[in-house]
Swiss-Prot record:
EC number(s) recorded for this UniProt protein: 2.4.1.-
Gene3D superfamilies hit by this protein: Glycogen Phosphorylase B (3.40.50.2000)
Top-level taxon of origin: Eukaryota
Keywords for the protein's UniProt record, in alphabetical order: Glycosyltransferase, Transferase
Record's protein name: UDP-glycosyltransferase 73C7
Family according to the record: Belongs to the UDP-glycosyltransferase family.
Enzyme class: transferase
Source organism (scientific name): Arabidopsis thaliana
Binding site for UDP-alpha-D-glucose: 291, 351-353, 368-376, 390-393
Record-level Gene Ontology MF annotations: UDP-glucosyltransferase activity
Gene Ontology BP terms: phenylpropanoid metabolic process; positive regulation of innate immune response; response to other organism
Keyword Cell division: no
Length: 490
């Protein structure tokens, strides 16, 4: 590669909102740099979403988007089901994983046609292990993107290398995770993410772990000041090839960028802003349990009744399909919507989360502890009320509540298992919800300390991506590293 040739990052996101959105933001951050070209490869429906989210950005013309066809019907999925969030049942997750990874041949062909400039590096989602094979074929480095924090990634690494899960028999027993800077305790299911498993996900998980180990480096949506010890330790564990470049949501500086980020919002920006402006500063609880929330209907009703009992203004985001249609019917038929209409805003579908969290009226965030939401809440300076569901979310809760002291636990201890949600039923009563909301939004010494701490972290987050900040500098170091790799090829 000649020194004057632009670097060409090929970004291949997994088709799920929680994976797609941060990788589009990372693409925007890279494309701002001189001498860097970025191409995103994704499926037809997701191309349309990305173009919409980028259409109001000055960077729209600098990011190339290549379309590939999602082979849903060949794997037994409904036609047009091109995002994990669209699955009617998470029992179809294996089918979706297989369909996503069947894109390898199309992606390879698209990369072969990239001549000026040819690809310099792949940024591949962890759920697309074929990206490691393509990196080897094209003899270029591959950076893996998990969408996790350094704390979670280091914890997963420790669990994998220590073999501690083999020594733990009970699923309910809490045990210390060895070799971490802080003393933290978990149950076996809470730390089983990205570990070898039995059952229908065995082969898929094995491929993901192998591709993770094969990757040249890791790109992480976090900032070093948030988790200093864990960023350092994880970088050591990955031979120095870890770049913390977040919070990537901060590339959406303008209100319109924030409102258009992600899927098409189910509420207009003006309507949302009007409601937020009508509330007192720091008075509103924002409630969103993620695009893959699988709580049973009984639990969702208890949550709603707890929010009502708290007498605090709130925004509650719920999904549109399946049991959430039943929830919407219950809200109307039970009189819930009528009773809370003066202080509650229910958004059915996608919400402009970064836009909402950045408003001065928001004083708390009830979250499932997905890393995007967790980091967006911290970046906005909003204390968190944590309700983890699955995946690495219990790890994120531990970071937020115990280590950062920026949040409060609602008290969930067991994972929600797909297909068995109704068996588990309601684990958190309306009274527990009410008490937790009152404590988070109250004026106790502990509540004030959480606000002080998260405000401090928010200031650090915003500085990280400023010129010369830690994440800004890490983007520079990443580009320099890939440039050296490209020049060493020839």
């Amino acid at each position: 590669m000649c020194s004057h040739d632009p670097l060409h990052f090929v970004v291949i996101p997994f088709m799920a909102q929680g994976h797609m959105i941060p990788l589009v933001d990372i693409s925007r951050l890279l494309s701002q740099r001189q001498g860097v070209t970025v191409c995103i490869i994704t499926t037809t429906q997701n191309v349309a979403k990305i173009k919409t989210s980028l259409s109001f950005s000055s960077l729209f013309a600098t990011i190339n988007i290549v379309e590939v066809k999602f082979l849903s019907q060949q794997t037994g999925l409904p036609e047009g089901c091109e995002s994990l969030d669209m699955l009617a049942s998470m029992g179809d997750m294996v089918k979706f994983f297989d369909a996503a990874n069947s894109l390898e041949e199309q992606v390879e062909k698209a990369m072969e046609e990239m001549v000026q400039p040819r690809p310099s590096c792949i940024i591949g989602d962890m759920s697309l292990p074929f990206t490691s094979r393509l990196a080897k074929k094209f003899k270029i480095p591959k950076l893996i993107f998990h969408g996790f924090s350094c704390f979670s990634l280091m914890s997963i690494q420790v669990v994998r290398e220590s073999g501690i899960l083999k020594m733990i028999e009970s699923n309910d027993e809490y045990f210390d995770l060895p070799g971490l800077p802080d003393k933290v305790e978990f149950t076996k299911p809470q730390v089983s993410v990205l570990q070898p498993v039995e059952g229908n996900m065995k082969e898929s998980t094995a491929k993901i772990i192998e591709a993770d180990n094969d990757s040249y480096g890791v790109i992480v949506n976090t900032f070093e000041e948030l988790e200093v010890d864990y960023a350092r330790e994880y970088r050591k564990a990955r031979a120095g090839k870890v770049w913390c470049v977040g919070p990537v949501s901060l590339c959406n500086r303008l209100g319109l960028d924030k409102a258009k980020r992600g899927d098409k919002a189910s509420i207009g920006q003006d309507q949302c802003l009007q409601w937020l402006d009508s509330q007192e500063t720091g008075s509103v609880l924002y409630v969103c349990l993620g695009s893959l929330c699988n709580l049973p209907l009984a639990q969702l009703k208890e949550l709603g009744l707890g929010l009502e009992a708290s007498n605090k203004p709130f925004i509650w985001v719920i999904r549109e399909w399946g049991k959430y249609g039943d929830l919407a019917n219950w809200m109307q038929q039970s009189g819930f919507e009528e009773r809370i209409k003066d202080r509650g805003l229910v958004i059915k579908g996608w919400a402009p989360q970064v836009f909402i969290l950045s408003h001065a009226s928001i004083g708390g965030f009830l979250t499932h502890c997905g890393w995007n939401s967790t980091l967006e809440g911290i970046t906005a300076g909003v204390p968190l009320l944590t309700w983890p569901l699955f995946a690495e979310q219990f790890l994120n809760e531990k970071l937020v509540v115990q280590i950062l002291k920026a949040g409060l636990k609602i008290g969930v201890e067991k994972l929600m298992k797909y297909g068995k949600e109704e068996e588990i039923g309601a684990m958190v009563s309306r009274e527990c919800v009410r008490k937790a909301v009152d404590e988070l939004m109250g004026d106790s010494e502990e509540a004030e300390e959480r606000r002080r701490k998260v405000t401090e972290l928010s200031d650090l987050a915003n500085k990280a991506l400023e010129k010369g900040g830690s994440s800004d500098s890490n983007i520079t170091l990443l580009i320099q590293d890939i440039m050296e790799q490209s020049q060493n090829q020839f």
